[in-house]
Curated annotation (Swiss-Prot):
Family according to the record: Belongs to the bacterial ribosomal protein bL20 family.
Protein's name in the database: Large ribosomal subunit protein bL20
UniProt-listed NCBIfam families: rplT_bact
GO BP term (any one): ribosomal large subunit assembly
Span of the signal peptide: none
GO molecular-function terms, A-Z: rRNA binding; structural constituent of ribosome
């Protein structure tokens, strides 16, 4: 049985990991052992934060909607309750955009919610 030398495969594997670790600080971008750990940890952070991003954006939208709603004399929870009663199906992303960039349109939506609550 011939002897297997791993020079080519090892170099390829090391190169792949070190390329993934480009831009990391110090040994994390130069030393294979350290770089491998850094790349694994980066992957864990990326996996976790892809899920957290969804939560963080929803929280941001809610904060923006709440600020816009309070400018129009209504709290966030009352606004959402009013929109549900009025059967207005605008998601929070769009509501937040209206609250930030289209104040008049958002005021009309708030008015619709107020009418449904009254």
């Amino acid at each position: 049985m011939p002897r297997v030398k791993r020079g080519v495969t090892a170099r390829r594997r090391h190169k792949k990991v070190l390329n993934q670790a480009k831009g990391y600080y110090g040994a994390r971008s130069r030393v294979f052992r350290v770089a491998k750990q850094a790349v694994i940890k980066a992957g864990q952070y990326a996996y976790r934060d892809r899920r957290q991003r969804k939560r963080q954006f929803r929280a941001l939208w809610i904060a923006r909607i709440n600020a816009g709603a309070r400018d129009n004399g209504l709290s966030y929870s009352r606004l959402i309750a009013g929109l549900k009663r009025a059967n207005v199906e605008i998601d929070r992303k769009v509501l937040a955009d209206l609250a930030m960039n289209e104040k008049a349109a958002f005021a009309a939506v708030v008015q619709k919610a107020k009418e449904a609550l009254a």
